């Protein structure tokens, strides 16, 4: 279902490498007060992230994942530097509502950035189920070779 939804983006990323091998990873996470995550674009092996939000009620709707765009339109995150960047380099576009029965999915690109604003609610339990799709290391090597060859 996710591959069909994001087919255009996947075709653009993998058009030069033929067979693509995927793996999945799931994590149940619980973020607490003062947790934050600076703008970042994830590891180069990541393809799609799906976050299934698991709050107990509507009281946490303002603590979802935020989407950012760089202030410098030419800024991209290379696979060599996929760490977290300073927030002052970005504009926050939206924070997804962290509400029951909701999910947020996105494709990893070199210019798509997300993060979590500092959690300031007392007794925060920010439960989410993360479902990530990755390419294999072999596929990543073929992808890097294709990028070098067809620059």
Spans of model-derived segments:
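Membrane-proximal basic amphipathic "stem/tether" segments
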Residues: 145-151
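Catalytic core of non-heme Fe(II) oxygenases with the double-stranded beta-helix
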Residues: 3-145
């Amino acid at each position: 279902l996710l591959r069909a939804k994001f087919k255009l983006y996947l075709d653009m990323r993998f058009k030069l490498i033929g067979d693509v091998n995927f793996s999945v990873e799931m994590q149940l996470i619980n973020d607490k007060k003062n947790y934050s995550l600076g703008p970042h674009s994830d590891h180069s092996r990541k393809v799609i992230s799906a976050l299934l939000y698991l709050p107990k009620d509507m009281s946490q709707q303002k603590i979802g994942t935020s989407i950012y765009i760089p202030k410098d339109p030419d800024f991209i995150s290379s696979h060599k530097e996929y760490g977290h960047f300073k927030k002052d380099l970005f504009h926050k576009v939206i924070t997804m509502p962290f509400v029951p029965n909701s999910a947020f999915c996105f494709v990893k690109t070199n210019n798509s950035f997300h993060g979590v604003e500092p959690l300031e609610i007392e007794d925060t339990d920010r439960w989410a189920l993360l479902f990530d799709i990755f390419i294999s290391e072999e596929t990543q090597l073929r992808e890097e070779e294709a990028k070098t060859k067809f620059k």
